[in-house]
Amino acid sequence: MNKLYIGNLNESVTPADLEKVFAEHKISYSGQFLVKSGYAFVDCPDEHWAMKAIETFSGKVELQGKRLEIEHSVPKKQRSRKIQIRNIPPQLRWEVLDSLLAQYGTVENCEQVNTESETAVVNVTYSNREQTRQAIMKLNGHQLENHALKVSYIPDEQIAQGPENGRRGGFGSRGQPRQGSPVAAGAPAKQQQVDIPLRLLVPTQYVGAIIGKEGATIRNITKQTQSKIDVHRKENAGAAEKAISVHSTPEGCSSACKMILEIMHKEAKDTKTADEVPLKILAHNNFVGRLIGKEGRNLKKVEQDTETKITISSLQDLTLYNPERTITVKGAIENCCRAEQEIMKKVREAYENDVAAMSLQSHLIPGLNLAAVGLFPASSSAVPPPPSSVTGAAPYGSFMQAPEQEMVQVFIPAQAVGAIIGKKGQHIKQLSRFASASIKIAPPETPDSKVRMVVITGPPEAQFKAQGRIYGKLKEENFFGPKEEVKLETHIRVPASAAGRVIGKGGKTVNELQNLTAAEVVVPRDQTPDENDQVIVKIIGHFYASQMAQRKIRDILAQVKQQHQKGQSNQAQARRK
């Protein structure tokens, strides 16, 4: 996606004219400008420069009296299902964007692109060409909160590599697995290790002191702490605070944090600009609930142990472009640094648990993008990459069959039903389309029921998307407190004959399941099987814990089914002999 199309050019424009205008705006390019009649092409060194050129020039810069129009150059054969939407209002909520995109078809993927502009950019994949064509026609120029959206095709790599016999993900032309695709059983797994950075928010007036003359101070911090430090000076121009990302070991991050905090305190004292400079840590919203703990216990313990005062920014401050919460720590420098260590320890634990849950999902849900689910906006540095392979994943041929339909019952607060349904049923319809699942809300069991049952029917990917959105909606609409994690009760039905396998000898399997997933798993005793000879398994926990437990139980059921089929096959062979 580094090749650019430059349109709306005068016939007299030459390569030298374009070279000059690119140089004036300090936009890097590679190779020569290929100028045609009224348009031109050029390559950029990487995707970052391509996006910067689009943001800098398109519709903003004139050349010989005509405004340049720049977008990604996409060959016709690659104009399929992928588009890029630019100039999205930064304060827009994911739900509003999803609602808009869903009007034109089924969104398979929605990833946010990192840019230096104040507005947001997303790459969207629809399920077919016609939906994509409609989205471009309707959305290009569409006014959204006083911002005119700009939409263009981007290359569809799957089309470029050929249809692959209708396979999804799959193998390249030389038979090698592409990234994110399932691999043959027994193939060595290479899990890319990604460390979560420490993200600090510092007052803009202290950024210069942190960097130092000609970068000397920040180089010294980097050298002493063996870390990589990014100061995001260009983002949010004019903002009172700037973000700093520290990439290192936990110890290196903490050492860098202490040095930065000491510099800010000294600068505040020397300039007499502030009596107190609190430590501000940025953490992705998905980790904050576990940092706070049940009834705020985890956070209170950190405060008591470190003798600090800790506050967390409101959920209302979250936007499409800002999925992070601000954790403000007040106290002595040493105490603030101790608090940072405890806070980041909790955040890293939550991150590692989520990575484990996603790795478990990956062979069942190939290619699933969490930004599309609305759980991890893709711009977040906390988002782990999709694993390139999973140990013990089934051979690719097993995915040629249609995924098995699953039925799950999720219990939500009764007062939340209206929020899930939406005005005139719009939200539940959009959710159903988005997840490609059947979603129905059962009538209350009694007039004063405090919970309602949501019945979701669909394959594993649909379950993941639909349940994820329901958890997110309940938190977003404040049905759970700001210091409370969303934990729901979920029921799945299993054959009565397989219930013993879920429990295990002396409860061993169910205990292991609870330890592994952090969910509460209960198989009620003395159940009467229903008309399909099935019994209920109850799962209680936060989203990832619940998902992990569901998948592990489905794995157990699949093994039972496989053994049963194998036994029947052996009996049939014995009879034939």
Curated annotation (Swiss-Prot):
The modification Phosphoserine is found at S12, S73, S181. Residues 195-260, 276-343, 405-470, 487-553 form the KH domain. Residues 160-190 are annotated as: Disordered. GO terms for biological process: CRD-mediated mRNA stabilization; dendrite arborization; mRNA transport; negative regulation of nuclear-transcribed mRNA catabolic process, deadenylation-dependent decay; negative regulation of translation; nervous system development; neuronal stem cell population maintenance; pallium cell proliferation in forebrain. GO terms for molecular function: mRNA 3'-UTR binding; mRNA 5'-UTR binding; mRNA binding; N6-methyladenosine-containing RNA reader activity; translation regulator activity. The modification Phosphothreonine is found at T528. Residues 2-75, 81-156 form the RRM domain. It is found in: Nucleus; Cytoplasm; Cytoplasm, Perinuclear region; Cytoplasm, P-body. InterPro entries: IGF2BP1_RRM1, IGF2BP1_RRM2, KH_dom, KH_dom_type_1, KH_dom_type_1_sf, Nucleotide-bd_a/b_plait_sf, RBD_domain_sf, RRM_dom. Expressed in fetal development and neonatal life, but is undetectable in adult tissues (at protein level). Expressed in embryonic neurons, including in hippocampal (at protein level) and cortical neurons. Also expressed in transformed tissue cultured cell lines derived form adult tissues (at protein level). GO terms for cellular component: axon; CRD-mediated mRNA stability complex; cytoplasm; cytoplasmic stress granule; cytosol; dendrite; dendritic spine; filopodium. SMART domains: KH, RRM. Phosphorylated at Ser-181 by mTORC2 cotranslationally, promoting binding to the 3'-UTR of IGF2 mRNA. Transmembrane segments: none annotated. PROSITE patterns: KH_TYPE_1 (PS50084), RRM (PS50102). Residues 312-323, 485-495 are annotated as: Sufficient for nuclear export. Keywords: Cell projection, Cytoplasm, mRNA transport, Nucleus, Phosphoprotein, Repeat, RNA-binding, Synapse, Translation regulation, Transport. RNA-binding factor that recruits target transcripts to cytoplasmic protein-RNA complexes (mRNPs). This transcript 'caging' into mRNPs allows mRNA transport and transient storage. It also modulates the rate and location at which target transcripts encounter the translational apparatus and shields them from endonuclease attacks or microRNA-mediated degradation. Preferentially binds to N6-methyladenosine (m6A)-containing mRNAs and increases their stability. Domains KH3 and KH4 are the major RNA-binding modules, although KH1 and KH2 may also contribute. KH1 and KH2, and possibly KH3 and KH4, promote the formation of higher ordered protein-RNA complexes, which may be essential for IGF2BP1 cytoplasmic retention. KH domains are required for RNA-dependent homo- and heterooligomerization and for localization to stress granules. KH3 and KH4 mediate association with the cytoskeleton. Two nuclear export signals (NES) have been identified in KH2 and KH4 domains, respectively. Only KH2 NES is XPO1-dependent. Belongs to the RRM IMP/VICKZ family. Can form homodimers and heterodimers with IGF2BP1 and IGF2BP3. Component of the coding region determinant (CRD)-mediated complex, composed of DHX9, HNRNPU, IGF2BP1, SYNCRIP and YBX1. Identification in a mRNP complex, at least composed of DHX9, DDX3X, ELAVL1, HNRNPU, IGF2BP1, ILF3, PABPC1, PCBP2, PTBP2, STAU1, STAU2, SYNCRIP and YBX1. Associates with mRNP complex. Interacts with FMR1. Component of a multisubunit autoregulatory ribonucleoprotein complex (ARC), at least composed of IGF2BP1, PABPC1 and CSDE1. This is Insulin-like growth factor 2 mRNA-binding protein 1. It comes from Rattus norvegicus. The lineage of its organism: Eukaryota, Metazoa, Chordata, Craniata, Vertebrata. The gene is Igf2bp1.
